A protein has these predicted regions:
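Acidic, metal-ligating active-site segments
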Residues: 18, 23-39
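Short, solvent-exposed loop/turn segments at secondary-structure junctions
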Residues: 88-91, 117-119
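Two-metal-ion RNase H-like nuclease active-site motif
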Residues: 10-20
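Short, ordered loop/turn segments at secondary-structure junctions
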Residues: 85-86, 113-114
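C-terminal binding/interaction regions
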Residues: 2-8, 42-44, 49-52, 64, ...
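Short Gly/Thr/Asp-enriched flexible loops that form oxyanion-binding sites at enzyme active sites
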Residues: 89-104
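Structural motif
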Residues: 78-79
Length: 152
């Protein structure tokens, strides 16, 4: 079913994680009625007392446990937007988005604020008067993946 030119994917969540000075993390999720995020349904947070240290290329080890906690008991999700890459290189090495797709079984869009050293494949997206691009990748969305790879 299409809604406003976008596929209806059901409840969508955008998530992010903030790291605490104590070594823990706070994850936040915004739930929306559709992929346009025009109608917000709820907000949630979860705190983890400890998380893994950052390792380049292994970001998911640090980020996925807090995301798991904030998304717990949300069986109606149809789309997840994460702060990071779905895949880390053109060969498809899995990043946070691919790991989240495998974990939750739903399509994931990865939106990264900086270019990862091996990520030569994402299309930089600039919005409005911004000069800093966002780098978009996806997992579990073959049509979007083809569109991103083609530069459309």
């Amino acid at each position: 079913m299409e809604t406003g030119g976008r596929p209806d994917c059901g409840v969508c969540a955008a998530v992010d994680v903030h790291y605490l000075r104590t070594g823990g993390a706070r994850a936040a999720a915004v739930l929306a009625a559709d992929a346009a995020f025009a109608q917000m349904l709820a907000e949630r947070t979860a705190v983890m007392p400890r998380v893994q240290p950052y390792q380049p290329g292994e970001f998911y080890l640090r980020e996925l446990p807090p995301l798991r906690a904030v998304l717990e008991d949300l069986s109606e999700l149809g789309l997840l937007v994460v702060d990071g890459y779905a895949d880390l290189d053109p060969a498809g090495r899995p990043g946070l988005g691919a790991r989240a797709h495998a974990e939750f079984g739903i399509p994931v869009i990865g939106v990264a604020k900086s270019r990862f050293r091996t990520a030569t494949h994402p299309v930089p997206v600039v919005r409005g008067s911004s000069v800093r691009p966002l780098f978009v990748t996806s997992a579990g969305m073959p049509a979007l993946r083809r569109r991103i790879w083609s530069g459309a």
